[in-house]
Curated annotation (Swiss-Prot):
Membrane topology label: Multi-pass membrane protein
Gene: SLC11A1
Protein name: Natural resistance-associated macrophage protein 1
Species the sequence originates in: Cervus elaphus (Red deer)
Function: Macrophage-specific antiporter that fluxes metal ions in either direction against a proton gradient. Localized to late endosomal lysosomal membranes, delivers bivalent cations from the cytosol into these acidic compartments where they may directly affect antimicrobial activity. Involved in iron metabolism and host natural resistance to infection with intracellular parasites.
Residue stretches spanning the membrane: 56-73, 83-102, 140-160, 165-184, 194-214, 238-256, 285-304, 347-366, 398-415, 427-447, 464-485, 494-513
Length: 548
């Protein structure tokens, strides 16, 4: 990208763009790359005209990104929201998906315009301590997401085997399937993207089948989708709303998408090509997230219809009088509202609509868990390489992430019961929401910087919308923490929560400060933080890192 965005000499320091020098034609990925080892060429077509051939060439990164909108954590969140609030939170699902699309649009633009992913840009701009803390929070989000994939896959195996495979056995099986995907990765980028497209299709068909047989009330569904209200809602519904946001807009997915778009050959010396790539990636992401929204809608609507205000005794009676009567004992015989999870959800569908519904549910759940496995591996590797400039093999990276995910999960599976495992899934959704500022604030910061994005920097409308998203997320998270802390079981937990809250608020405050600089608060830019106004000092560009 031509042009130095810095001001005249200030104390001997020059500032400018971080974009790597553009070079027409094929761009080779660095040695040791994974997804980026292969570049997809973009066909030449008439300039300015929409082309399906070009759209097909750009198709891939958006659908891989959309898998994070369909992992077992989302499925758990959907069915819990339906069971707890009926159709009342469908509008939260809709707008969370829209906000997710806006965040992913910014991530894709950053990758296309600069040729760098979000982790790499964070490495260049943030000082060492905030940078390391930021990296740790994203790694925590990745491990949390991987735990959800392990839980979902283990429960799917248990359902498909009629309980013959114990939960801990299903957890251990996930070690094997991970390495199967590493093997599949060797067959080429387009084949890998096609395979994940196949898994998304399986989810659409299986959960769509459940929607058809459940026949939700369409009038109430449309009202819940387009009228933003929640009459009679309390803390349980709030927890589900936070869980929906955390499950839909996942922190590591923003880092992932900014790197995935680099797999397409885009001549960044031509601004028309950059503008065109941004357009096609936005169209692809919109299509992909529309599909993911429909799948999530299917699940939430099915359980809003079948489970809302259902009692344990009613669920017991339904199963006791069905061909799956052996499963009836998983529901206590009392009049409390049933607390459904992804295991009980499959069972009650089978009791209501026949065994086929149970097995079809399990297949969809298995596809959700499997499809998320490889994208989590890619996200972990891109984040590690971007923040730390540390290159690990795919095998080593997936071994680290999956080991961190499996150890606590298998302990819960062995020593606790299924309800604890599903409860862990719910808490992981809330964790994703709490960690969301550590992805949204950096992407908003860097896409608002003319020194980084040149003429493609966020305009006023985009800044206002993105900032509103951030304020909303922070407000919901703060309200959740204030509501949750009094329910802690022991006073000793308060000191731990206070310590974590101090670190959380400290890092968030720093990220907000740097973000405000890029939004026009120039008085906050002191010393080395002038880079957030003018770009990276030239000596730091040459060294490829920040000082400190």
């Amino acid at each position: 990208m031509p042009g130095d965005m810095g001001p005249p000499k200030q104390g001997g320091t020059r500032y400018g763009s971080i974009s790597s020098p553009p070079s027409p034609g094929p761009q080779q990925a660095p040695p040791g790359g994974t997804y980026l080892s292969e570049k997809i060429p973009i066909p030449d077509t008439e300039s300015g005209a929409f082309s399906l051939r070009k759209l097909w060439a750009f198709t891939g990164p958006g659908f891989l990104m959309s898998i994070a909108f369909l992992d077992p954590g989302n499925i758990e969140s959907d069915l819990q929201a339906g069971a707890v609030a009926g159709f009342k939170l469908l509008w939260v699902l809709l707008w969370a998906t829209v906000l997710g699309l806006l965040c992913q649009r910014l991530a894709a633009r950053l990758g296309v315009v600069t040729g760098k992913d979000l982790g790499e840009v964070c490495h260049l701009y943030y000082p060492k301590v905030p940078r390391i803390l930021l990296w740790l929070t994203i790694e925590l989000a990745i491990v949390g997401s991987d735990m959800q994939e392990v839980i979902g896959t283990a429960i799917a195996f248990s359902l498909l085997s009629a309980g013959r495979i114990p939960l801990w056995g299903g957890v251990l099986i996930t070690i094997v399937d991970t390495f199967f995907f590493l093997f599949l990765d060797n067959y080429g980028l387009r084949k890998l993207e096609a395979f994940f497209g196949f898994l998304i299709t399986i989810m659409a068909l299986t959960f769509g089948y459940e929607y058809v047989v459940a026949r939700p009330a369409q009038g109430a569904l449309l009202q819940g989708l387009f009228l933003p209200s929640c009459a009679g809602c309390g803390q349980p519904e709030l927890l589900q709303a936070v869980g929906i946001v955390g499950a839909i807009i996942m922190p590591h997915n923003i880092y992932l998408h900014s790197s995935l778009v680099k797999s397409r050959e885009v001549d960044r010396s031509r601004r028309a090509d950059i503008r065109e790539a941004n357009m096609y990636f936005l169209i692809e992401a919109t299509i992909a997230l529309s599909v993911s929204f429909l799948i999530n809608l299917f699940v939430m609507a099915v359980f809003g219809q079948a489970f809302y205000k259902q009692t344990n005794q009613a669920a017991f009676n339904i199963c006791a009088n069905s061909s799956l009567h052996d499963y009836a004992t998983i529901f206590p015989r009392n009049n409390l509202t049933v607390a459904v999870d992804i295991y009980q959800g499959g069972v009650i569908l089978g009791c209501l609509f026949g065994p086929a519904a149970l097995y079809i549910w399990a297949v969809g759940l298995l596809a959700a868990g499997q499809s998320s496995t490889m994208t989590g591996t890619y996200a972990g590797q891109f984040v590690m390489e971007g923040f730390l400039k540390l290159r690990w093999s795919r095998f080593a990276r997936v071994l680290l992430t999956r080991s961190c995910a499996i150890l606590p999960t298998v302990l819960v599976a062995v020593f606790r019961d299924l309800r604890d495992l599903s409860g862990l899934n719910d808490l992981l959704n809330v964790l994703q929401s709490l960690l969301l500022p550590f992805a949204v604030l950096p992407i908003l910061t860097f896409t608002s910087m003319p020194a980084v994005m040149q003429e493609f920097a966020n305009g006023l409308v985009s800044k206002v919308i993105s900032s509103s998203i951030m304020v909303l997320v922070c407000a919901v998270n703060l309200y959740f923490v204030i509501s949750y802390v009094p329910s802690l079981p022991h006073p000793d937990y308060f000191s731990l929560v206070a310590l974590l809250a101090a670190a959380y608020l400290g890092l968030t405050t720093y990220l907000v400060w740097t973000c405000l600089i890029t939004q026009g608060a120039t008085l906050l830019a002191h010393s080395s933080h002038q880079r957030f106004l003018y770009g990276l000092p030239e000596e730091d560009q040459e060294n490829g890192r920040t000082s400190g």
